[in-house]
Amino acid sequence: LISLFVSKRLPALLHSEVPATAIAAAILAFCGTAFALPFGKTYPEVAIETGHIEGQATEGVEAYLGLPYAAPPIGPLRWRAPQPPAPLKGLKQAFQFGPACPQIPSKDVKLDEMSEDCLTLNVWAPERRPGKRAPVMVWFHGGAFENGASRMPIYDGHNIATHGVVMVTLNYRLGHLGFFGHPQLTEEAAAEGVPTANYGLLDQIAALQWVQRNIQAFGGDPSNVTIFGESAGGIGVLA
């Protein structure tokens, strides 16, 4: 069922292991659909580096969806390395997934669900315990670097979070917007002293940096992060 499934610990970070049951649950959950039932919701608030966000808690798991981890890669930021996100205005309700990055429409991702302003991630966190930090798992979706999105139901992280893990999924630029190479872009990047090409992989790195800076707010341990992915997502892990 899984063409290339790779799990990797971030180097020199971890002191405790992600529970084996959580790894198994992650694999099984991403081979089938996992949905949280909308009963008994509460609305927790969390302060992150860009402002305050409000999530939804169901069955002991808090969900925060569509969180920008980088500025919209449009206009002068198209075909550029990801830049920091702007501060939030007021309390942001993180109830909806962000749009998918542009790609050929499919049964999984419709055209009206896409936007170039797509660099968002989602966090599912178990109930926080004072003095305790939960291990973190970050998922890179597959799709040949041409399609896929974190909003797809198969990537819902609720069930994994019930195993005591903070679960993160994310979008990254795809196709010609994520992996376009051209001599002019190379020259411009060299003149500016910034990275060029493989923008989708740079997005993944930016998301991991966001996790390092912010995951404690959700009860996660930034020194205990596992990245994993399937197909193109597995290649991203290896990269």
Each language-model region and where it sits:
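Non-catalytic accessory segments of hydrolases
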Residues: 36-199
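Glycine-rich nucleophile elbow surrounding the catalytic serine of serine-hydrolase chemistry
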Residues: 230-239
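Alpha/beta-hydrolase active-site loop
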Residues: 193-215
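Short, well-ordered alpha-helical packing segments
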Residues: 157-161, 205-212, 238
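Alpha/beta-hydrolase fold nucleophile elbow
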Residues: 219-230
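N-terminal secretory signal peptides that target proteins for export/translocation
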Residues: 1-16
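Bacterial N-terminal signal peptides
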Residues: 20-33
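Serine-hydrolase catalytic core recognition
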Residues: 121, 214, 228-231
